[in-house]
Amino acid sequence: MNAVDVVVMAAGKGTRMKSRTAKVLHRLGGRPLIQHVMDTARALHARRTIVITGHGAEELESWLRQAAAAQGAGAPDFVRQEPQLGTGHAVQQVVPVLPDDGIALILNGDVPLIRPETLQRLVEKCGGERLALLTVEMADPAGYGRIVRRGEAVQAIVEHKDANEAQRGIREVYTGFMAVPSARLKAWLARLDNDNAQREYYLTDIVKFAVADGCAVVASPALEQVEVDGVNSPLQLAQLERAFQQRQARALMEQGVRLADPARFDLRGTLSCGQDVEIDVNCVFAGQVSLGNDVRIGPNCVISDARIADGAVIHAFTHIEGETAGVEVGEGALVGPFARLRPGARLGPEVHIGNFVELKNSSMGRGAKANHLAYLGDAVVGERVNYGAGSITANYDGANKHRTVIEADVHVGSNCVLVAPVTVGQGGTIGAGSVVNKNTDPGVLTVARGRQVSLANWQRPKKPAKK
């Protein structure tokens, strides 16, 4: 089998995006457009990957190196196209680093939804001997190069701006993807000229050279148009985002996940689900999220980098943000509505976290409860603790963060402040309104608040009477 070398064209400016960010670094499904293409190329086990950069080259190359390192993969090779004089000129920059003895698979960095199996068929069509073009039929092919045939054989690709009236009526178009024997590609690139309306070097002109040299030119059709749709504007990016999310929603439902409305679901990472999972509308999942069996997610939740165990319920409007340290929700736990779990939150089985409760870098043991209006930061909370409304851990002294330990079976009354570092002993009770800054013994009642005084003859100050 011939080795495959992937060439990714990513030098364009993307003027219609009206952005300072390189076009291929705009995100779709939480990942840059080009990352989708790179991940697809990696699935083909290519010998090497070469990225053609130009506009925003430093930013793009730096990002791709970092992304490869994060995935434990080798960084791609880079070549620069400066200035940008067309697609043919772009691929000419690859010639010095492209081996002669393989198949060059040429991809576009702004076409994120291409499938690995589609590219594999394209490579197989090439077979190391033919020029294989990925094509698709479009209802409105305006702006695309038309596939001109003689019978079944492809004779040429005519760019839209150079096409005559008859050619503009052709609905089969070239998508920008091709597989070609590398040695022949190099020879044909050397023959390109810019004798056209745009005064650019068109990669598509190699088709006529192939025909003249007696090399078979074959078309490999894409299964659906969305695979080959590119991004040139914010509107097109939004349209592809919806298509991508629908693709992901469909895949999850085929696995048995029950989505209340697949049109109101966003996945910007990876989501693994057990059996009988239910997800209500307008939920966003990012990073790596795992949902166990019988998990229910209420409407309008945002969940990133979290593991949610069997039978847990996440009520409406809950934010779970595990980006740096992850979040774990134990079996049968109840969270929300309007709760916030930040990085490092660890909930044991049957924990209850209610409305307007926030946890960061804190753990709660089995059956512990914080049902409303509370904050726990840098805390270790034991089993069966009841943490009252309005209570907080004061964990930050302005320079360093400190640990609070609340041992098992403690009851913390409402509106308490636990000033870290501090430990509340097992089975103890903290009276409402207390400010606790010293360790307490097990089983005792601790009250740390000012004495209540009532003044019978006190009169409220009055404003002077208006004249």
Predicted regions and their residues:
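Structural signal for interior beta-strand "rungs" in well-ordered beta-sheet cores
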Residues: 258-447, 452-453
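Short glycine-enriched, charge-decorated loop/helix-capping segments at active-site entrances
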Residues: 21-27, 192-195
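N-terminal nucleotide-binding beta1-loop-alpha1 segment
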Residues: 1-19
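Conserved alpha/beta core of the MobA/IspD/sugar-nucleotide pyrophosphorylase nucleotidyltransferase superfamily
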Residues: 2, 171-274
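Conserved core of the sugar-phosphate nucleotidyltransferase
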Residues: 114-197, 204, 215
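Residues that recognize and position ribonucleotide moieties
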Residues: 26, 112, 171, 178, ...
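Short beta-strand/turn micro-motifs composed of small residues
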Residues: 10, 53, 108, 135-136
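Conserved N-terminal catalytic core of the sugar/cofactor nucleotidyltransferase
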Residues: 1-5, 31-124
